[in-house]
Curated annotation (Swiss-Prot):
Name of the protein in question: Nucleoside diphosphate kinase
Amino acids binding ATP: 10, 58, 86, 92, 104, 114
Localization per Swiss-Prot or TrEMBL: Cytoplasm
Top-rank lineage group of the source organism: Bacteria
Gene label: ndk
Lineage, opening ranks: Bacteria, Bacillati, Actinomycetota, Actinomycetes, Mycobacteriales
Length: 136
């Protein structure tokens, strides 16, 4: 089933100049990039994107990190795009859970600085795409 997902290359991925490497892996996986933009993330967008984590102990540091520098926001499309990208990204903890061959397993340094975000469900993808690409 063809679906869409939102992917963010987080500030650590942009700062470390890994955009090309990450996009190459996305394209090699067979996912199409239907929208892509380098963006500075404002507080309102960050809060809306991470609303499910509000009230958790790490919420403030999450907002601080995602607004610390530009991100690459992209919409990917393809068969089972959500699961396909999440498999490509690897576990959220790059050191302990992400396996070699994944973006985080090969390139990630620590849990908060784990390079990429990918939508985790069709509902999240729809909400996140509407937030980051309102006209799409």
């Amino acid at each position: 089933m063809t679906e869409r997902t939102l992917v963010l290359i987080k500030p650590d991925g942009v700062q470390r100049r890994l955009i090309g490497e990450i996009i190459s892996r996305i394209e090699a996986k067979g996912l199409a990039i239907v929208a892509l933009e380098l963006k500075n993330v404002g507080d309102d967008t960050a809060r809306a994107h991470y609303a499910e984590h509000e009230g958790k102990p790490f919420f403030a540091s999450l907002l601080e990190f995602i607004t610390s520098g530009p991100v690459v926001a992209a919409v990917l499309e393809g068969p089972r795009a959500i699961a396909a990208f999440r498999q490509l990204a690897g576990g959220t903890d790059p050191v302990e859970k992400a396996i070699p061959g994944t973006i985080r397993g090969d390139l990630g340094l620590e849990t908060q600085f784990n390079l990429v975000h990918g939508s985790d469900s069709p509902d999240s993808a729809a909400r996140e795409i509407a937030l980051w690409f309102p006209g799409l």
